[in-house]
Regions:
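Tubulin/FtsZ superfamily GTPase core signature
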Residues: 1-389
Length: 389
């Protein structure tokens, strides 16, 4: 069996729930593991492999919303976790940040996987703004910690759910939308490397794009008719549940499948390159499927987003924004402790405060180099946790 072995590890209550929803969707070619400190809650996880961690420390009663307990529990059970991950080529670690087990244990699980040489991807959620402030503080700390121990990290702010669902949508239905990002990431990558195609992509291509690349953007789009490729690729790069764009990405995988033409492939690749910039390394895959009459599906995985910070594109980890500032000042470290004002700065062309339309260059941005960056209108909002500093 030459197929890459992919494992999804759901850590804590939210992680276990995400695994359950993926199992319900019957995603093939993936192994699932449920990890929790709460013995009773763990029994509700449908994963074939269940790991109760920190049994001596927590007595099976959970982490009590204390990340330090979750961390110690994972460290206590490190041998069991490593044994469960043995033989994997790629591991997705998913959790809801802000509580005890997910926030504390997920970075430990990720570190164990990465130390074993496994390509490790984190997919985590941030709490709703209406939740306790302490929970958000825990979440942001947890995101910083897991980021140190994964090759690639995808952050899903739960507040984004409020923008895409109506008022009558139930809580379970809304949270299922967040889990769809994880599902798309896993399904998209398994299809890339396990399904034969006209232009084939393999696990080595995935490693090239995702190994040690930091913050990532992933999306899947569908289209029909004459403009199906453009319709699908726009949907994929916008990913409404993420706060990232592909602007300034260093590496991008584009995989297009369906009833596709050469023109469709060219349209999709050209659009992505226009957004990401001339220096982006694009790896392209294509799978022709005549059964999908006049329709196509496009998967876009963009990584290395923070590497372009010096070119004026600052990725929004944990709800940050793409601040319009001189590129010489835009480094990840310089953002820490900055006193950021909530009013939009005036550009050199006197257009301060005017939000650009989506998928358009930001007018008047300071350009030491040729920058083809675009940000969505919503990305100009200054996050609450930075305003409070």
């Amino acid at each position: 069996d030459v197929a890459a072995k992919i494992i999804v590890v759901g850590v804590g209550g939210a992680g276990n729930n995400a695994v359950n929803r993926m199992i319900d969707e019957k995603i093939d070619g993936v192994d699932f593991i449920g990890v929790n400190t709460d013995k009773q809650a763990l029994q509700l996880c449908k994963a074939p492999k269940l790991l109760q961690i920190g049994e001596k420390l927590t007595k099976g009663l959970g982490a009590g919303a204390k990340p330090e307990i979750g961390e110690k529990a994972a460290e206590e059970s490190a041998e069991e976790i490593s044994a469960a991950l043995k033989g994997a080529d790629m591991v997705f670690v998913t959790c809801g940040m802000g509580g005890g087990t997910g926030t504390g244990a997920a970075p430990v699980v990720a570190k164990l996987a990465k130390d074993m040489g496994i390509l490790t991807v984190g997919v985590v959620t941030k709490p709703f703004r209406f939740e306790a402030k302490a929970r958000m503080v825990n979440a942001l700390n947890g995101i910083e910690r897991i980021k140190e121990h994964v090759d690639t990290l995808i952050v899903i702010p739960n507040d984004k759910l409020l923008e895409i669902v109506d008022r009558r949508t139930t809580m379970p239905e809304a949270l299922k939308k967040a889990d769809e990002v994880l599902q798309q990431a896993v399904q998209g990558i398994t299809d890339l490397i396990n399904v034969p195609a006209v232009i084939n992509l393999d696990f080595a291509d995935v490693q090239t794009v995702m190994k040690d690349k930091g913050i990532a953007h992933i999306g899947i789009g569908e289209g029909k008719g004459d403009d199906k490729a453009m319709e699908a690729v726009k949907m994929a790069v916008e990913s409404p549940l993420l706060e990232t764009t592909i602007s300034g990405a260093t590496h991008v995988i584009i995989n297009i499948s369906g009833d596709i033409t050469l023109a469709d492939a060219s349209d999709a690749a050209s659009y992505v390159q226009e957004l990401a910039g001339d220096d982006v390394n694009i790896i392209f895959g294509a799978m022709y499927d005549e059964s999908k009459s006049d329709s196509c599906t496009i998967t876009v995985i963009a990584t290395g987003l923070e590497d372009k910070a010096n070119n004026g594109v600052q990725n929004r980890l944990g709800g940050g924004a793409a601040f319009r500032q001189p590129a010489s000042h835009m480094t990840p470290s310089s953002l820490k402790g900055m006193n950021i004002q909530s009013t939009a700065p005036t550009t050199s062309q006197g257009q301060g405060g005017q939000a650009p339309r989506p998928i358009q260059p930001v007018p008047g941005i300071h350009k030491p180099t040729d920058i083809r960056s675009s940000v969505e209108e919503k990305s100009l909002k200054i996050p609450d946790f930075l305003q409070r500093k």
